Amino acid sequence: MVEGWRNGFRDATNSKPLFVTIYATVIIGVLVSSFYVFSAIYSPTNGSSSFLSFPPLSTSGRIHSLPQENATLELPVAPPPPPQALPPPVLEEAQGNSLGKIWVSPPRDKKMPPLETFKLTKELFGERVKDNVIIVTFGNYAFMDFILTWVKHLTDLDLSNILVGAMDTKLLEALYWKGVPVFDMGSHMSTVDVGWGSPTFHKMGREKVILIDSVLPFGYELLMCDTDMVWLKNPMPYLARFPDADVLTSSDQVVPTVIDDSLDIWQQVGAAYNIGIFHWRPTESAKKLAKEWKEILLADDKVWDQNGFNEIVRRQLGPSVEGDSGLFYAYDGNLKVGILPASIFCSGHTYFVQAMYQQLRLEPYAVHTTFQYAGTEGKRHRLREGMVFYDPPEYYDSPGGFIAFKPSIPKSLLLDGKHTIESHFILVNHQMKQIRSALAIASLLNRTLVMPPIWCRLDRLWFGHPGTLQGSMTRQPFICPLDHVFEVNIMLKELPEEEFGPGIGIREYSFLDNPLLPKQVKESWLDVQLCQEGKEGCEASNNTSPSRVLKFPKRSNEDTFKAIFSSFDDVKVIKFSSIEDAFIGFSDKEREERFRRRVKRYVGIWCCEENKTPGHIYYDMYWDEKPGWKPVPPQTPEEDHPPL
């Protein structure tokens, strides 16, 4: 098209001046119109779906290098800034050129079609298939934000051959009006979060198996996904490398078996095959497996879907399929299976704890929030820490603004000596005390606290271990997910104010580096430097330097904080250069007691010491008030409770 305009303009310049004027006018008009149209489409204030205005999030991981020389470590509030976010994709690219458009809402004057319209049929699936592949997830209304995140990542990757199974009509209607392809699972489930391991959770697993068994006879390849995972890279070319595979499955493997993007070596994979990400081809062997798997689950409602899958697939393992594909025979000796490499089809451990893909210099395709704690809230927070979760715009511009601080950790706590339970708790407790002060200040100023990155020496698991999983690529020390130390679900829960005081909002440590943070937040900033009262220039005042820096006395009380910082209510982000010794306590003792009751519940456990029953150790938010406190497991059943 550009070449055509160029040739036309060249011809015009060789003819009459009138034509030159006409061509110039037309070209200018096209450029102005294009600018107007694209501005309207991608303006953040556009009334269309807010997801269309989001730029693709950074998928770069983060491993923090540790300075070895300084006696005291000044750690960043968040990791180094991610690569500059790409601009939003061209509308047709984001929505798919050949399939029905995504994120285009039906006209509001249109009535909701009858439920039968969304019935699972070959024709409905056929409308979304591309290259004979369909990508599917399913869930209920409680997981709608996960589902929208899942869909948005795929459309950012220019994938539109997707369908979402709705397990309740509330989700079905909500997705329909957002322009997301949806079908009715016919489950009529509750719209609330059912909880991992609950009977309803197991029912959801059975729905997955029934769905696979129903879809494979349609003749389409099925990439089946849980809603608590996101796609970071188009997996279609990778899956196409293994055309002979009947099933390609992810796994819970935490020890690398390969260092490139080959399939994991099946003989070395001892962990469970994880059915949160797996690809099925409509072969006779795959159909036979799906049918038997369904029958086993329907016959015994106590069998977990993933356990059932592992049991029948592992009836026979091997031999390898001829060639060097990495496939192997399993199940009945005819099923050809491949195990997706855990380094790039990541679990919550290989991605968030080990950052295995980054250490091996590989590009991750997906991350699944396994190996985590604190339930659904913990999963959401993990994805937020990784800057791969899509929240609505108001999440990034909270009323009251934000408070952040730069943690300070002595080098000796982080790097010196052996990595033991004692050295781990000394390190974490040092950070916990600073977080406790920051929570108090956030509560005083009615601001949302941006949590700092937390450094750990030891991994957290469900069983006794020597500190890290042997053979894994976990570095020590490492920035551990917030749910390793804090009960994220409790921090986000609405607790009765009369007993626990006002709620305290939190954000993930990477929040201020997120490309979705709006300009009005990034540019509204106050740096606070603590100083020793009595020294020159250090007095309780709201006077700032020309570079927008406020000097503030250490060991200030509640009244001083309120008096000074009330002058900065319009500032979005207040960042303290240090939080140590900033606050000496609440003036209102009843409020302080309610605050203590609240934050005592915020911390969790470390697990677990080897050869001890029980082997878990409770974190204690007020460890420093107990002389001689030691990190030891409960010695009696009466001691086995959080230190409330």
From Swiss-Prot:
Main location: Golgi
Compartment(s) where it occurs, according to its Swiss-Prot or TrEMBL record: Golgi apparatus membrane
PANTHER family recorded: ARABINOSYLTRANSFERASE XEG113 (PTHR46936:SF1)
Protein name stated in the entry: Arabinosyltransferase XEG113
Enzyme class of the recorded protein, top EC level: transferase
GO cellular component: endosome; Golgi apparatus; Golgi membrane; Golgi trans cisterna; trans-Golgi network
This enzyme's EC code(s): 2.4.2.-
Keyword Transmembrane helix in record: yes
Motif DXD motif mapped to chain: 226-228
Function, as annotated: Plays a role in the arabinosylation of cell wall components. Involved in the arabinosylation of extensin proteins in root hair cells. Extensins are structural glycoproteins present in cell walls and its arabinosylation is important for cell elongation, root hair cell development, lateral root development and root hair tip growth.
Membrane topology: Single-pass type II membrane protein
Cytoplasmic domain ranges by topology: 1-17
Glycosylation sites: 46, 70, 446, 542
Source species: Arabidopsis thaliana (Mouse-ear cress)
UniProt similarity note: Belongs to the glycosyltransferase 77 family.
GO biological process terms, semicolon-separated: cell wall pectin biosynthetic process; protein glycosylation; root hair cell development
Molecular-function GO terms, alphabetical: arabinosyltransferase activity
Lumenal side stretches: 39-644
Disruption phenotype: Increased elongation of hypocotyls. Reduced root hair length. Reduced content of arabinosylated extensins in cell walls. Increased lateral root formation.
